[in-house]
Amino acid sequence: MSGKFIVIEGLEGAGKSSAIASVVTHLQAKGIQVETVREPGGTPLAESLRDLVKKKWEEKVSPTTELLLMYASRVQLVDNIIKPALSKNRWVIGDRHDLSSRAYQGGGRELGDELLQKIRKITLGNFTPDLTLLLDVEEKKGLERARERGELDRIEEEDLAFFQRTRQRYLNIAAKDPSIIVIDANQSMLDVHQSILRAIEEYLF
């Protein structure tokens, strides 16, 4: 079986980490070789860029600067880790991909989807995930979960309106793209994981 690239998306506190662990266990039980990656990050250089993005700076970080750092990290990961793994027929499970930038920078930062699409075309070309699972959680609930984990980073400290714009952009894009499956992440963890595994079975097997 050829390699597949599955991405788990969602706001802070949506439950991406536990969902990824569930997907990995499910696929490995089928005898599939699986690699996991995260964005931003995933290579030494990309992890350094992640630190720059999340750090709390004394100066204002331009939304465009933030966006370009995200894509620099993303290209490094795709070219050095994801594409080589797929070429070896391994499955890659990603904690975020460029849908995050379209939602967070395009929606939350209000840069607009036209700019995001142009940058995506320049940096990634026609490379896209085989399936994206969007864990949709109510903004307040997601932020409460994130705060319970500990100290928030620069982006996690944004106000509620930022996350409302981000969530709405996620849902608007998903409504027009059949490769993005929306999962209700307000359910119990067990129900969320079952919904995810059903979607994977339906769309990729």
Curated annotation (Swiss-Prot):
Family matches, as SUPFAM superfamilies: P-loop containing nucleoside triphosphate hydrolases
GO-annotated cellular components: cytosol
Biological process annotations from GO: dTDP biosynthetic process; dTTP biosynthetic process; dUDP biosynthetic process
Pfam families attached to this UniProt entry: Thymidylate_kin
E.C. number(s) listed in UniProt: 2.7.4.9
Keyword Nuclease included in the entry's annotation: no
Catalytic activity as recorded in UniProt: dTMP + ATP = dTDP + ADP
Binding site for ATP: 10-17
GO molecular function: ATP binding; dTMP kinase activity
Enzyme type, top EC level: transferase
Keyword terms of this UniProt record: ATP-binding, Kinase, Nucleotide biosynthesis, Nucleotide-binding, Transferase
Described function: Phosphorylation of dTMP to form dTDP in both de novo and salvage pathways of dTTP synthesis.
Name of the protein in question: Thymidylate kinase
Organism this protein belongs to: Idiomarina loihiensis (strain ATCC BAA-735 / DSM 15497 / L2-TR)
